[in-house]
């Protein structure tokens, strides 16, 4: 399915959203974050921003009920969003998460900090990678929409692994968003 509207959520720096927008030549219609210290608005022009300031706001995500006019035609992406999505939002909206762990091959990388889990046991993994999956109530259990992987043979440092996972993450988002978003004119 293709969506006309795109809402992106982040808790970290927002850098992934900046890089994705450059790759796909499309910006989100709205960016929601619980971290306004990243100054993402200086890097992505022409986007409405909403900053969540209380734990209730980013725990319930009721803001989605306020800003989404057409749930069937709206894609919501989690780009470094570090919060659990409430079950009612998982079923009501089309939400997809980028996960920097190749959970299709290594289900033990589900959940928090898969990069560190992989690094601790890098000798067990012949490849590393990222997925984009639908968000469901169970963490990292939704249908996989796309994945990308690279060999771990030449990864010698944690920083090299982070770089490789960042590249696979951008590749998965690039593929997924180009397939599922209409371009804005």
Language-model features, listed with the residues they occupy:
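One-carbon transfer enzymes
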Residues: 1-185
């Amino acid at each position: 399915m293709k969506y006309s509207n795109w809402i992106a959520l982040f808790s970290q720096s927002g850098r992934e959203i900046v890089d994705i927008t450059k790759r796909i030549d499309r910006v989100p219609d709205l960016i929601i974050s619980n971290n306004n210290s990243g100054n993402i608005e200086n890097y992505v022009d022409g986007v409405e921003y909403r900053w969540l300031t209380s734990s209730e706001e980013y725990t319930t995500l009721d803001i989605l009920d306020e800003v989404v006019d057409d749930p069937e035609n709206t894609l919501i992406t989690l780009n470094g969003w570090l919060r659990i999505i409430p079950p009612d939002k998982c079923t009501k909206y089309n939400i997809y998460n980028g996960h920097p762990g190749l959970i299709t091959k290594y289900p033990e990388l589900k959940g928090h900090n898969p990069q560190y889990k992989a690094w601790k046991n890098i000798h067990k993994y012949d490849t590393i990678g990222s997925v984009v999956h639908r968000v469901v109530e169970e963490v990292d259990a939704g249908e996989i929409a796309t994945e990308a992987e690279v060999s771990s043979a030449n990864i010698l440092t944690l920083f090299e692994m982070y770089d490789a996972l960042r590249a696979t993450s951008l590749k998965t988002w690039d593929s997924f968003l180009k397939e599922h978003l209409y371009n804005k004119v």
